[in-house]
């Protein structure tokens, strides 16, 4: 019950086709692919900068320290 079977995915695909039509689906897929590609390039660009990620100072706020 927790996972989606192939039938669930087919029903979702059918609803998407009915809502958007077959003409718009390639454009939506292309836009989604470009978004994922841009995200991956941005993540790789951040890693190539050579700067280590900033560390959190680990401050303790008085309200949090009393609640433990």
From Swiss-Prot:
Keywords from the named record: Cell inner membrane, Cell membrane, Membrane, Protein transport, Translocation, Transmembrane, Transmembrane helix, Transport
Superkingdom of the source species: Bacteria
Transmembrane segments: 1-21
Protein's UniProt keywords contain rRNA processing: no
Annotated Pfam families: TatA_B_E
Statement: the UniProt record of this protein carries the keyword Transport: yes
Principal subcellular localisation of the protein: membrane
InterPro entries assigned to the protein according to its UniProt record, in alphabetical order: TatA/B/E, TatA/E
Positions of region (Disordered): 42-68
Gene Ontology cellular-component annotations: TAT protein transport complex
Localization (cell): Cell inner membrane
Membrane topology value: Single-pass membrane protein
One record GO biological process: protein transport by the Tat complex
Entry GO MF terms: protein transmembrane transporter activity
Family to which the UniProt record says this protein belongs: Belongs to the TatA/E family.
Record text on subunit structure and interactions: The Tat system comprises two distinct complexes: a TatABC complex, containing multiple copies of TatA, TatB and TatC subunits, and a separate TatA complex, containing only TatA subunits. Substrates initially bind to the TatABC complex, which probably triggers association of the separate TatA complex to form the active translocon.
Role description: Part of the twin-arginine translocation (Tat) system that transports large folded proteins containing a characteristic twin-arginine motif in their signal peptide across membranes. TatA could form the protein-conducting channel of the Tat system.
Protein name listed in UniProt: Sec-independent protein translocase protein TatA
Organism: Chromobacterium violaceum (strain ATCC 12472 / DSM 30191 / JCM 1249 / CCUG 213 / NBRC 12614 / NCIMB 9131 / NCTC 9757 / MK)
Upper classification of the organism: Bacteria, Pseudomonadati, Pseudomonadota, Betaproteobacteria, Neisseriales
């Amino acid at each position: 019950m927790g996972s989606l079977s192939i039938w669930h995915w087919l029903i979702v695909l059918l609803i998407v086709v009915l809502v958007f039509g077959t003409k718009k689906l390639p454009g939506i897929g292309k836009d989604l692919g470009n978004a994922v590609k841009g995200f991956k390039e941005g993540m790789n660009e951040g890693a190539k900068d050579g700067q280590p990620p900033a560390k959190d100072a680990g401050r303790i706020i008085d309200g949090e320290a009393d609640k433990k």
